[in-house]
Amino acid sequence: KGGIGWKDFKPLTLEDVPAEVEAMTLPTKDGRTRNTTFMSSGDYLAHRAKIAAEQQGITEEELYQRVFDQVSQQDPETDLDYESGVSGDPRTARASKTVVHSRPAAPRPLPQTQSGDLNLKDQTALMARHLYRIRTRRGECSALATNGHNLIVNVHMITDLKDDDPVMLLPPNHVTPITISFHRRDIVIIGNSDIAIWKNIARLPAAPRFSKYFVRASDLSHFTTFNGMIYSRGADGNVHEYHGTIQAIRETKWYGTPYVIRKDGETIKKEIFLSGWTSDISTSHGTCGSIWLAKENAYGKPFQRRALGIHIAGFTSQYSGAFAALLTEEDIEGAIDWDIDTSAAELEAQSMCISTREHTLVGPGYDTIGAVAPKDASFNPSKTNIIRSKTYGLVAPPVTAPAILTPLDPRNPTQQHPLRKALTKYESRTVPFPASARKPVTQLIEYKLSKTLGPCQYYDLTLDEVVNGIAVPGYAGLEMESSPGYRWKKLRPSGEEGKAFLFNDRIADAGFTFRDENGPQDPVPGWPECKKLWTMKPELEQRVWEDLSTLHRGERPLFIWEHQLKDERRPLKKIKDVNTRIFTMAQVNATIVSRALSLHFVAKFYETVGQGFSAVGIDTSSPIWAKLRRDMLNVSDRGCDGDFGKFDGTLDPDLIMDSLRIIARWQDHLTLWRKDHETGQWTSLVFGPKELERALILMANEFIHTYQLVFDCLHRKWQGNPSGNCLTVVINTIVNAMYLRLAFAYLRWKNPIALLPIAAYDRYVKDWFYGDDNVLAISPDILDWFNPLAISEYFATLGLEYTTADKSGIKQQVKKVKDFRFLKRQWRPDTEFRHLMWDPIDPDTINELTNWIRINPDIDPDLQLREQFSNALREAVAHDRRFYREFLRKCNDALKQCNLDQFPDEFDGFRTSRIGRLAGVSVTAETKLAENSATVISVRI
């Protein structure tokens, strides 16, 4: 049809081929051998394009564009399609059958055969969900994720990469691309082949154990010539199948000099081994990394293990064909660190869906699985439980309002469902931190936590203790008032709230224990006082034990999380922007499983509040509040208070994974016990160091790549930490601490004059973290290059928004410590006892307690409003006497207008009681402060 086509390129001679191309002896269809030059298909076509462009007197870019324009108008059945990977002379292209699949956003449910193995069609469909398009400096090709967070790649695609170079991955189903950071320590090359395993990529959803579909080394003798296919992810994002004949390549290895006869009459031994595969299938630029699969043998019988190897090269002779390197099950499993499997969870998730229909609320940042049946759909509240109080607007103008929950809300000008905007929280893609810096920062955080927490003291738990906690500070019980989550809530009897219906409750005497002489030994005394104790009902307990057993085997159980809009008050500006926050609710069994694996760490993390970098669990009306400020002033009186935008949704996957590894290594090992309440028999699950770390890696994958439900749309996210995760605040706090140290690592590298090791961070910075909030006192020695402006600019390059605590943006270089805001509070020295630090909260927060109430059918609205006024007055004391009395006057004026009882002036009593808490002693309102001044001072010392 005119113009330039690939057939116009002259055949290459050996002299034309770049130095890295090798010459090999490969068999042809008739069994004879031919000296054939091969190279990677990407290098091959790039070289041919360069020659053709020089012949025509045009640039390579012009050549590619003209070819693309030409083939886009041709019949894809008979002509060339450069983008989809079909190349070569059309006459030879007919020799192999090419099928291009433009798959829907979600594949159909995958049934299993009676033998338990997937047939070829379903096996490739499962692989398609984990077959990526990888883009490096060398070009693009396919790459298969397998056995967890591992990627099978071609070595020639990564040879030019340096540590910390970014690599782009294009996921299936046209999901937004992701970026990963290269580091050579994560690469394991398989023998001397062109195949490598890229290990531990947290940004990838954990893949099934595809190694079980690859051929075993012991079965290679069964493969000679057979029908097969190449399975590839094309540049257009679609899956491509290339069908043809595959032939095994066998080589001979001699032990000694060939043909030498020994004295005993035997020849020197030789070994014939299979080294790869060749095929008559035509391939093209970008086909590397594709999976070679066997369809059936010469007798028409299917192979049990069909995956044979990875495509690495195309022929440069006039004959069409391709070459693949052998990859066996043993090769894969010998190269990876953690052999985990997610196939059961994926198959179960897909079997829940009755169609592949997408939902308009779910954007390209999610991987859509499909639509569930109407009976399984999730529903969001459409009516708020927050109403105006009788004193609305009488004390102070409102600065908040109930969040918008429906598209029909008159305050919603776009009439778009607020869930659409809320879901974008998890759709953002961030750039990974440099892998070379992440490792030392993780080690620094792990060391700091080990020094702060000390060694783990307990190494076992019963399931009842997981639910109720134990008689040790920090071991709080499971919260019973919240929803039990997906499916469980449909079992809840009418009129009941929370999750208590899934538990049996009883009153226990002091000294009660969940153990006995036939089970685990009791590491602590029983309960210190009578309390209500909960035991799981059989259905829930069985499900929890099955989930724990699944994790123990290295497999991921299926947990379904629900997106729910938060029924809360939002700033008026957020209302105007229809910015409603989202809550991702976990199933109760997922919460109990997470508690079982991490409760010892979480309890110690809360117990040691104010001793390391964490403020989680702090009582701001305690001496710890003053300690936080005092520790910062020991380093500097200047620094910054910070916060992150969309923190949960943009949380770095690698750092989430690192956080869970830290928890696993601190715990080291764990034994979980379950008692059969009918027979009294105990059973246990023993998590050794490897099993525990593997289980928590699977839970990290659960938190990062969560299966979520919004209405009837089941989808999976790619990064972030779900807000309903019981470990949310712990993970967020640890990752927040890592963020600032990674910023320090980058900025001190950017300023060579500051030749400081990463460990010097704690010498020049004193920080405190609570979730996404942080405060940093920064030494003047480094403030010129490690300051809030430089920090926010660095985070912006990674797609993270770092701003001041009031969300107004970083406008000043630094702040005084006395002006810091942390947890919506500040530090204010007492006017009489300067060492005591008050914790005044934002005045708007106090005022809003008088404007709104939440509907509670069990409490009279007037009594509820009065309780809120009382709480507001107690908070007003933390400011000063003048603020309190002005606020009291406004409150009483408002109450008088509404014919409600007014409040007396109780400033002195409130202050005395609060000072006792600030000093760490119990002081009643009747106790004179002067009589306790010695006690207060002694506490300070």
Residue ranges of model-derived segments:
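A structural micro-motif recognizing beta-strand termini
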Residues: R135-R137, V155-H156, W198-A206, W277-H285
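Extended, non-catalytic subsegments within catalytic or DNA/protein-binding/adaptor domains
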Residues: I152-N154, T159-I180, I189-S193, Y231-R233, ...
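C-terminal subregion of chymotrypsin/trypsin-like serine protease catalytic domains
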Residues: K270-F273, S284, I291-A371
